[in-house]
Curated annotation (Swiss-Prot):
This is Trigger factor. Residues 161-246 form the PPIase FKBP-type domain. It comes from the Bacteria. GO terms for cellular component: cytoplasm. One of its GO terms (molecular function) is ribosome binding. The gene is tig. It is found in: Cytoplasm. One of its GO terms (biological process) is protein unfolding. Its EC number is 5.2.1.8. Involved in protein export. Acts as a chaperone by maintaining the newly synthesized protein in an open conformation. Functions as a peptidyl-prolyl cis-trans isomerase. It is an enzyme of class 5 (isomerase). Consists of 3 domains; the N-terminus binds the ribosome, the middle domain has PPIase activity, while the C-terminus has intrinsic chaperone activity on its own. The lineage of its organism: Bacteria, Pseudomonadati, Pseudomonadota, Gammaproteobacteria, Vibrionales. Belongs to the FKBP-type PPIase family. Tig subfamily.
Amino acid sequence: MQVTVETTEGLERHLTITVPAANIENAVTAELKKIAKNRRFDGFRPGKAPMKMVARMFGGSVRQDILGEVMQRHFIEAIVKEKINPAGAPTFTPVDIAEGKDLVFKASFEVFPEIVLAGLDQIAVEKPAVEVKDEDVTNMLDTLRKQQATWSDVDAAAEADSRVTIDFIGSIDGEEFEGGKAEGFALAMGQNRMIPGFEDSIVGKKAGEEFTLEVTFPEEYHAENLKGKAASFAITLHKVEAQELPELTEEFIAKFGVLDGSIEGLKTEVRKNMERELKQAVKGRIKEQVLDGLVEQNDINVPAALIDQEINVLRQQAAQRFGGDAKNTPELPRELFEEQAKRRVVVGLLIGEVIKTEELKADEDRVKAIITEMASAYEDPTEVVSYYEQNEKMMSNMRNVALEEQAIDALLAKAQVTEKEVGFNDLMNQPAA
């Protein structure tokens, strides 16, 4: 076997591989003999059919199969010999496949980029300094009560936290516009669902009133035809409701799994959950900044084959989220996933290089800690831990999670880290970058 390596611009590689004709012909002959021995032919006893007849009937298809197998096998031998690491499946192009002549074919593929990590000491990380305070727990209790709240009609003017039922018709320059009309619309005030000024104009009005309000759509409004436009809304207020929050009774508290029914018990459980969520949020915020810095400091070429693979994964996940079957769901445009897919591939390659450079191995104690922490959110943590420990595939996934955490820790040790005090709600409500 002869191999010629052609290095093109970027990550593309071409191998021209030559396989002696004798290798092909011997393999074809051996396969035809198997067919002659094992297949029944009319007019001939088993194994007695003439080879010429067998070759005439099956020679073409057998040769095609053999060529495919030979190209695949010799490609693998070639990349091992040349110490090449392909990033995806090759494309084979026959150059000379004439019978009786040496097989010559070209294999085209991409390789993984050679990565030399740089700028790790330039990664800037702002570590949130935050804790769950008593007032945060109190606010969370109020949130839980609001989730269980009821509404009742009141004969009073609407307030900033009322729920109102309205009809409205919107118009611009006297003309109604699409999406600007509704009947029996229930609006919980104070949640910023409407454009600025809309809810303010309802405050102080009572059921049965009809009025007109003047507002201006924000410049950043999602509908292009409404951005920055002045509009009028004719409103009929049908109903005003006030929110009634449940008391912190034993019955209410029991809904959250606090068996002793005490307020202190509920506070303890709520604080525990908040601290668990906070820990994950802090970890996630730090990880996000570390990865952003790593990508910013290391501009690498990315194999298109890996991006294509990741796009397919994201497509399947999207189909599942929408409750569909990937096979029966129309293929979503690759443009929807391309940027995210490339980011994932870049991060994966760079983290892989960190693991290699730092010679990291999954810390089994960390693996156990990750599983234990995750299991603590379930009713029976011991059962969850046992389930993971008995499933090798899931344990392998957890080892990968631990390994990634160790890589983040290694990068964090080299990064420029500062601390910034932040409130619980500010951190938890901070949008992802």
